[in-house]
Design a protein with these regions (language model features):
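Feature recognizes metal-dependent phosphohydrolase scaffolds
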Residues: 1-317
């Protein structure tokens, strides 16, 4: 929300108090212009508002990278150690090593990072995070909307012979379904989607004292940015690189092979069969896939088997 200037949604819409973050950011980064943390798509902010926004943006981003690193450490099975980039920084020299190559960093001011323990939250960061968590947990309207999504939504839906889903069905380059190890068993296709659906519900509905709840919550984070997540569909999320590295080759996020393969009718038929659907009247309705109309791309693909719904209503697109 901060990155795209949408704090009004949190503050006015859901009643979540951003003052603790603003106060912390102004104090912690008072001598830091935070220039690489500009607010996207916002031109009507007063200069002081933009400065505060940049400081808040950096403050929560640093906390994000620390907490994400901790999640990855807890789950070696995610195979995301290469994304713990705070540990790949040489804080004395101001460089970060990514996939074996050193890059100079665009920002080297990290007053809250201990180079010996870069993932450790400071006392102030920990208190701020706890305060923000409590604000989110006690927002009645937010939970009303979340419950609506859980009641009416699903990871996929079969309806009138059609298959609807968001993102992709993870695939390998040879067209076979990409697997994920879940509780010691490799799951693919529909079995993987069903398992993910179960974890999504556990993350919200299990009681706070159930040890499976925290694991499911961590898995929800993996779904947002993990390489084998059907709702992400890329090899990595390069947020860190966008902030700190000028070399745009590090910004690239490679799409899952699904996105090319699904343009073939026979691949779509195989996906439909995986979900118990077949015949001329069956189609895939695929959400969250931008359609580049200006480049001549069409939303109907695979000889009419695949309908792609663009994310064009988003300001970011």
């Amino acid at each position: 929300s901060i990155r795209y200037g949408n704090l009004d949604i949190l503050e006015d819409g859901y009643g979540i108090n951003m003052l603790p973050l603003a106060t912390y950011a102004m104090e912690t980064y008072k001598d830091d212009p935070c220039t690489v943390f500009g607010i996207k798509g916002v031109s009507d902010y007063h200069s002081l508002e933009q400065e505060l926004g940049r400081k808040m943006h950096k403050a929560i981003a640093v906390i994000q990278f620390k907490v994400e690193g901790q999640i990855i450490k807890r789950h070696p099975g995610y195979k995301m150690d290469d994304r713990i980039l705070l540990e790949a920084v040489d804080y004395n020299r101001g460089v970060v090593t990514i996939e074996g190559t050193e890059y100079p960093m665009l920002d080297t001011m990290f007053p809250t990072i201990d180079p010996k323990h870069p993932l450790r939250l400071t006392k102030e960061e920990d208190e701020l995070l706890h305060t923000l968590i409590m604000s989110f947990r006690h927002s009645g309207l937010l939970h009303k909307h979340i419950r609506f999504l859980y009641t009416n939504g699903a990871l996929y839906k079969c309806h009138n012979g059609n298959l609807l889903y968001h993102g992709c069905i993870p695939m390998r380059p040879d067209g076979s379904f990409e697997g994920m190890i879940c509780n010691g068993e490799e799951l693919t296709g529909r079995a993987l989607m069903d398992y993910i659906g179960e974890q999504i519900h556990k993350a919200y509905f299990l009681s706070e004292d159930d040890p499976d709840k925290n694991s499911a919550r961590d898995f929800m984070w993996y779904l947002w940015c993990g390489a084998k997540s059907p709702v992400f569909g890329k090899d990595k999320m390069t947020t860190f690189e966008h902030y700190f590295v000028a070399d745009k080759t590090t910004h690239r996020e490679r799409l899952n092979p699904y996105y090319k393969l699904s343009q073939q009718e026979e691949v779509c038929d195989r996906i439909l069969q995986e979900f118990g659907l077949s015949g001329e009247g069956s189609h895939i309705i695929n959400g969250h896939v931008p359609v580049k109309i200006k480049d001549g791309e069409m939303p109907v693909k695979a000889n009419g088997k695949l309908f792609v719904i663009d994310g064009g209503l988003s300001k970011a697109y």
